Amino acid sequence: DLILGAGVSSKFFLACRPPGHHAFPSMGSGFCIFNNAALGAKYAREKFGIKRIAIVDFDAHHGNGTQEIFYGDSNVFYMSFHQHPHYPGTGGPDETGCGKGEGFNLNLPFMPGTEEPDYMVSLIDIILPLLERFEPGLIIVSAGYDSHLSDSMSSLGLVEGSYWKIMLALSIFCRWACNGRMGIVLEGGYDCGSTADSAVNTISACLEDSTIMKIKNIDDMENYFKVDNDYRKNRVRNRLMLDELRKNFNLN
């Protein structure tokens, strides 16, 4: 309501517990009872008539509940970075939607030990081009900080500044595509210190107005984050998987 109705803000951060992305329409799972991101997307569509919504999930675990809810829906594009293999065992790169929703579900299953470079290359080479093609009216971010190096719930290697970069990239895209409108909901994060610091970095990135206004396209963003061919070749662990996803989603 604050974003789409009253226009009080273009972004919000919902610091909620329990998390939600493992919850299904008829049952909870994986510490989750209600699927906060899915409820927000459905509410935005039904009350405000937002036709297309993207959900970007960077929790360490695949959001199996969110994926199932929208798997056959061409108006909600679910995109998930997560460790694989890991709980709940879903989220393979071949899970791309069904029926009308085919091609509107993207999974980026990262091997244990994956660090920031894979996330940044995935954003610039895959997620942002797909978002440009999709033209969402709202982006909802499932912000899970259990992908932090200090969190014992995964073997991923992000740090506080990684979330700042991810969220800055998404904030820049939101300005281009959907009048800056973005909702962020807290998912996992079980190391209290790193979760708190990562959330602060998330919010800080959303407030970087001068940088957000300065970057005009994906090429500018690539230069700003210094993601060049050498970076792609020498610092990315999941390069073969990302190359296959580019091919499958016609991004080559």
Predicted ranges, named:
Residues 1-252:
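A general "terminal functional-core" signal
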